[in-house]
Design a protein with these regions (language model features):
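ALDH superfamily catalytic-core signature
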Residues: 5, 11, 17-166, 186
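Short active-site oxyanion
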Residues: 9-12, 179
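Short acidic/histidine- and often glycine-rich active-site loop of Leloir-type glycosyltransferases
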Residues: 71, 170-173
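C-terminal lobe/hinge of AMP-binding adenylation domains
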Residues: 165, 172-175
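Low-complexity basic/metal-binding stretches
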Residues: 171-172, 179-186
Length: 187
């Protein structure tokens, strides 16, 4: 609230839920601020065949699977050119599998638990829904067990391929790969 109303703040940028975004937008705008609110947004990335594929994959994995995989500025949706999709996907899987999943208090942990048992079940349900709708599950994070935290709320990196428009994995904030043959086909 302080930022939304403070006279020295000239603009606000927000990514997150619609209900919070509407509050931020209306409050900040009422105080004369410029507002950018991406509500229920899903960030997209394009990967072309001339990209530095391995370096791009590592950057995307670092972005996407930090903060227990709940980072609003991640790239959970990738449109990957068919000519490089298999190679790129192999790098994504390599780096996702290498993430250290563990207790949030361990400095070596790269992917901690989700917030609750209910949230874990919700994520597992989203993954199952993607499989039911026909997206190809390349890396399944549903059955992660962390030694010493067997009852923890851990979900590992999950990657879908062949996600199509209209699938839940493509429309909601779930990480998926959508292949295409040319830059104009998917843009």
């Amino acid at each position: 609230e302080l930022l939304l109303k403070h006279p020295d703040i000239r603009g606000i940028s927000y990514v997150g839920s619609t209900s919070v975004g509407l509050h931020i937008y209306s409050t900040a705008a009422a105080h004369g601020k410029r507002v950018q609110a991406l509500c229920e947004a899903k960030n997209h990335g394009l990967v072309l065949r001339d990209a530095a594929l391995e370096r791009s994959a590592l950057g995307i994995i670092n972005s996407t699977f930090g903060c227990a995989g709940m980072r609003c500025m991640a790239l959970p949706a990738l449109c990957v050119e068919e000519a490089c999709a298999d190679e790129f996907l192999s790098y994504l899987v390599k780096y996702a599998k290498a993430r250290k999943i563990g207790c949030a208090y361990d400095p070596a942990t790269e992917l901690g638990p989700v917030v609750s048992a209910e949230h874990k079940q919700s994520v597992i349900n989203w993954i199952s829904k993607g499989v039911e709708e026909g997206a190809k599950l390349i890396l399944d994070g549903r059955n992660v067990v962390v030694p010493g935290f067997e009852n923890g709320h851990f979900v590992g990196p999950t990657i879908f391929d062949h996600v199509k428009p209209g699938m839940t994995t493509g429309d909601c904030e779930i990480f998926g790969i959508q292949r295409w043959r040319s830059p104009t086909e998917n843009i």
